[in-house]
Amino acid sequence: MARKPASSQDFETTLAKLENIVAHLENGDLPLEEALKEFEQGVQLAKLGQERLQQAEQRIQILLQKTEDAPLNDYKGNA
């Protein structure tokens, strides 16, 4: 039975589930209805993974922009 992806799962879990579904589908031994359910869940997981990547990219862009707005000063250690 196909599972619904949890929106709170992390990217690595999503990717592992997607890879598992791809492996099942590549075997080619699933009945049509089960293959369609697996494919549907795979599409949902791919979308969720893409959203996670976009969120990470946005966070990185925000951090980089903050760095550009506040340039780093030379470090003067305890010399």
Curated annotation (Swiss-Prot):
GO terms for molecular function: exodeoxyribonuclease VII activity. Its EC number is 3.1.11.6. The keyword DNA-binding does not apply. InterPro entries: Exonuc_VII_S (IPR003761), Exonuc_VII_ssu_sf (IPR037004). One of its GO terms (biological process) is DNA catabolic process. It holds the Pfam family Exonuc_VII_S. It catalyses: Exonucleolytic cleavage in either 5'- to 3'- or 3'- to 5'-direction to yield nucleoside 5'-phosphates. Its main location: cytoplasm. It is an enzyme of class 3 (hydrolase). GO terms for cellular component: cytosol; exodeoxyribonuclease VII complex. Keywords: Cytoplasm, Exonuclease, Hydrolase, Nuclease. It comes from the Bacteria. It is found in: Cytoplasm. HAMAP family: Exonuc_7_S (MF_00337). Belongs to the XseB family. Bidirectionally degrades single-stranded DNA into large acid-insoluble oligonucleotides, which are then degraded further into small acid-soluble oligonucleotides. Heterooligomer composed of large and small subunits. This is Exodeoxyribonuclease 7 small subunit. It comes from Haemophilus influenzae (strain PittGG).
